[in-house]
Amino acid sequence: MFTGIVQSQGRISNVRESNKFKSIEIESNLKNFDIGSSICCSGICLTATKKKKNKFTADISNETLEKTNSKYWKKGNKINLEKSLKIGDEVSGHFVFGHVDSTGELKEIKK
């Protein structure tokens, strides 16, 4: 679970695609998380599958690719990052799960 308050921005430094998932490597200054931690990446809950000094990797399933804009993410893109909420953390935003159920289409913007 997340608060929706962006903690950092990361940059996608590498993308690998297969027929089962898309793997992204993100350069970031996030600290104090482990492999297996949930990281909110531009509103999408992803799991850190690898971790290096200032980088981590997350795999995006085909279902998540279909239901989110992550299908358009490419090397060099910046994404918003937030580590998962821990008991005792301040909740200054609102509760966000990061699990996408469906997508909508913006039909009109009025100014």
Give, region by region, the residue ranges found by the protein language model:
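Conserved loop->alpha-helix
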Residues: 1-111
